[in-house]
Amino acid sequence: QVVGLLSVQGLILKKGTIVDSTIIAAPSSTKNREKKRDPDAHQTKKGNTWHFGYKAHIGVDRETGLVHHVEVTSANVHDVTVVPALLTGDEMEVYGDSGYLGADKREGAITRNTSGKAIRYRINRRPSQSKNCTLRSRGQIRRREREKSSVRAKVEHVFGVVKNLFHFSK
């Protein structure tokens, strides 16, 4: 309902969506009344660290930074599988980090918006993908990646508010 009201007032412009996810930690201990772990939470590895809990996947309007979709899954669900649920269908561009590589090629991917135009997926590369390039093209790639990252910063602000201001953890 809130998203509908914001759309009517023109606050959600639907020109582009930024997608990202964050891990919401849950206690992995069995030292509780039921003597059990949370059955819906799972573990995942991020870098070299294991985490137990959930993932909050969000879709944020590119222009305003307002959240229009939220999906919560167990932590072992890969980011790229949730992308269709985070899109409005009206966007022209989708931004995401390297965890979303191949989102446009997956089965069930939304490749055209409601007006029939192709949606452009602007996903950051992994750093290792530009190692085999020439120095000149590496500079161009670095510039393009920085542009994508500057747009994606809006979604990180949302996670900062959720985790720091609201102390969001289970």
Which stretches of residues belong to each language-model region?
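Helix-centered, glycine/charged polyanion-binding patches within enzymatic domains
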Residues: 92-93, 98-170
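Polybasic low-complexity intrinsically disordered regions
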Residues: 1-111, 117, 124
